[in-house]
């Protein structure tokens, strides 16, 4: 399910030093999925891409695609469905906030 940026939610999972992030449609959908796993993942996540941040400091910073090696080392698999399921199940839901909106000062 594709959602507009205004509705996107990050789900962040940090088992050790690296934070892994997926983009979900919105927080209520993630909570609905957590209660009812029969809801298709395609209704919850925008894609099956897993990200980390360029600075490895939580969920802030530029998102970069996590390598297969990072996924294997952390999750024991690089299979996207398994990794996304783990992040959705145990991750922290962070509502999206627009980046780059600046007021011009004269």
Swiss-Prot record:
Keyword flag Cytoplasm: yes
The entry's keywords: Cytoplasm, Nucleus
GO cellular component: cytosol; nucleus
Keyword match Cell cycle: no
GO biological process: ribosome biogenesis
Subcellular location: Cytoplasm; Nucleus
Location, primary (coarse class): cytoplasm
Function of the protein: May play a role in RNA metabolism.
Family the entry assigns: Belongs to the SDO1-like family.
Protein name: SDO1-like protein C21C3.19
Organism: Schizosaccharomyces pombe (strain 972 / ATCC 24843)
